[in-house]
């Protein structure tokens, strides 16, 4: 589950279909709200960055995992990413095209923040290196709206 900026005790449980979870600390209960229907896609959308408030809605960066067996029969995977933007009610969403940061099999985004006119994106590669990427907001918006 992923925290949602400006929504205390709310988490993004699923991206597709969008499902939010609210935690009630007094009773230690949770409630799940489904916001939209499943959109058929090749791979499952999984975790990534937290969900940040952006313009009139919310933005996150997720990864998709293409699972397969290696030549030796071992479980293997390739990770690719998408930006996902929702309106303020989490009803309508836009997906960017799928992409890779470094064209490596194992990549995992773990942070997204707005900093002036840029987004700062933190990610790991090959389970042994960490990076921070500074991307202009205008570039990300074009990428989402292609």
Where are these regions (language model features)?
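A short, acidic, amphipathic alpha-helical segment used as a generic capping/interface helix at domain edges
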Residues: 104-113, 117
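Hydrophobic core register within WD40 beta-propeller blades
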Residues: 1-3, 49-51, 110-112
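Beta-rich carbohydrate-recognition and catalytic domains
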Residues: 2-43, 53-105, 123-146
